[in-house]
Amino acid sequence: MIFLYKIFGKWDPTEVEVRDLGIKRYVSLAPVIVPHSSGKHARQQFNKSEISIVERLANNLMRTETNTGKKQVTLRAVEEAFDIINRKTQQNPIQILVDAIANAGPREEVVRLKYGGISVPKAVDTAPQRRVDTALRYISMGTNAAAFKSKRSVAECLATELIGAANRDTKSFSINRKDAKERVAKAAR
């Protein structure tokens, strides 16, 4: 009998399919019970893609000054959000997370080039690693903004944000930010 670890002891990451081939290499679905690696991948530049995607989401949620360092609280909120997602959609919440990341990551961005003292915006394709990082940042920013001075818990706000991003709902903060960034890039072509 082969025993595979499930994330939080409930959800099997081996059932999850990354449909966006561009980010497949950068979304780690390694089976772990508790997504907490203690930062062992922080020494090398691109090793963050080896960390479980659930842990990277939790790390991004700890960005605000009130949540800094409270990883157990954040992991509990992520687990509760996954329970809410499972109740609402009847799907594996890790699949919803992966779909949300694929939908919320901008494909095109703007860089500023200097030509003789004049800065000119130019549209460029976004690297897959940066797409994943930006999508996680937008999802966590949307969650924190929705939960700030609200009666709703962080878990409820995270579940709403992930479901909205997975369904490409424009009311979702992350999809809205992605569309705005791509709109600026389209104008700079």
Swiss-Prot record:
The keyword Lyase does not apply. Coiled coil: none annotated. InterPro entries: Ribosomal_uS7, Ribosomal_uS7_arc, Ribosomal_uS7_dom, Ribosomal_uS7_dom_sf, Ribosomal_uS7_euk/arc. The keyword Methyltransferase does not apply. Pfam families: Ribosomal_S7. Keywords: Ribonucleoprotein, Ribosomal protein, RNA-binding, rRNA-binding. Gene3D superfamilies: Ribosomal protein S7 domain. One of its GO terms (biological process) is translation. One of its GO terms (molecular function) is rRNA binding. GO terms for cellular component: small ribosomal subunit. It comes from the Archaea. One of the primary rRNA binding proteins, it binds directly to 16S rRNA where it nucleates assembly of the head domain of the 30S subunit. Is located at the subunit interface close to the decoding center. NCBIfam families: PRK04027.1 (NF003106), uS7_euk_arch (TIGR01028). Belongs to the universal ribosomal protein uS7 family. Part of the 30S ribosomal subunit. This is Small ribosomal subunit protein uS7.
